[in-house]
């Protein structure tokens, strides 16, 4: 059973539920096409990571966004 975990830091209110559905469908279709997996067995999880819980270069994404 393929298990795919997508981690996103939401920006500007997104992703929307429709965009999440498109990601789930698109990633599942790609697994079928590239790895010949059974679509019914593919699990896709989308984790939305708060910008205070993710850092780059020693600073939180929240802090970096405030600087720009």
Swiss-Prot record:
InterPro entries: 4-OT, 4-OT-like_dom, Tautomerase/MIF_sf. The keyword Ligase does not apply. The keyword Isomerase applies. Gene3D superfamilies: Macrophage Migration Inhibitory Factor. The active site is at residue 2. Its EC number is 5.3.2.-. One of its GO terms (molecular function) is isomerase activity. Keywords: Isomerase. Belongs to the 4-oxalocrotonate tautomerase family. NCBIfam families: taut. This is Probable tautomerase jhp_0858. It comes from Helicobacter pylori (strain J99 / ATCC 700824) (Campylobacter pylori J99). The lineage of its organism: Bacteria, Pseudomonadati, Campylobacterota, Epsilonproteobacteria, Campylobacterales.
